[in-house]
Amino acid sequence: MQGRLSAWLVKHELVHRSLGFDYQGIEILQIKPEDWDSIAVISYVYGYNYLRSQCAYDVAPGGFLASVYHLTRIQYGVDQPEEVCIKVFAPRRNPKIPSVFWIWRSADFQERESYDMLGISYENHPRLKRILMPESWIGWPLRKDYIAPNFYEIQDAH
């Protein structure tokens, strides 16, 4: 079974993979990083005018990093807006995903947080820099292979 956006993408021969539906009935799609730019624009034109949230996670040690976008179609007079969840998987060694800041401005801080915590580089983001950690921080704290520094050793050194 396909959701409305997935059916539309198939009809227009746009590459994606349906991952089924979550517990709320929201369709989950997988998009390749190189296709995300065009599918994000198409999603906006299709009516997904609100980026509810963007987050990222480390799929597995040594595996892919995922950037997740929850999009909603906000329309007047509609009590149950249509939603879709889009996952973009990037290789761990050089995780690059096109930024959607220019489509949904609310992606600004959310993409910066994903960069700060996992090291995903959002291409064409206007201010991609750390937002939670100091600029001097080394590494990506939410990666499963991250080794936390020993803060007691650092304090004792002073």
Swiss-Prot record:
Pfam families: Complex1_30kDa (PF00329). One of its GO terms (cellular component) is chloroplast thylakoid membrane. SUPFAM superfamilies: Nqo5-like (SSF143243). The keyword Membrane applies. Keywords: Chloroplast, Membrane, NAD, NADP, Plastid, Plastoquinone, Quinone, Thylakoid, Translocase, Transport. It comes from the Eukaryota. GO terms for biological process: photosynthesis, light reaction. The keyword ATP-binding does not apply. It is a peripheral membrane protein. Its EC number is 7.1.1.-. GO terms for molecular function: NADH dehydrogenase (ubiquinone) activity; quinone binding. It is found in: Plastid, Chloroplast thylakoid membrane. HAMAP family: NDH1_NuoC (MF_01357). NCBIfam families: PRK12494.1. NDH is composed of at least 16 different subunits, 5 of which are encoded in the nucleus. NDH shuttles electrons from NAD(P)H:plastoquinone, via FMN and iron-sulfur (Fe-S) centers, to quinones in the photosynthetic chain and possibly in a chloroplast respiratory chain. The immediate electron acceptor for the enzyme in this species is believed to be plastoquinone. Couples the redox reaction to proton translocation, and thus conserves the redox energy in a proton gradient. Belongs to the complex I 30 kDa subunit family. This is NAD(P)H-quinone oxidoreductase subunit J, chloroplastic. The lineage of its organism: Eukaryota, Viridiplantae, Streptophyta, Embryophyta, Tracheophyta. The gene is ndhJ.
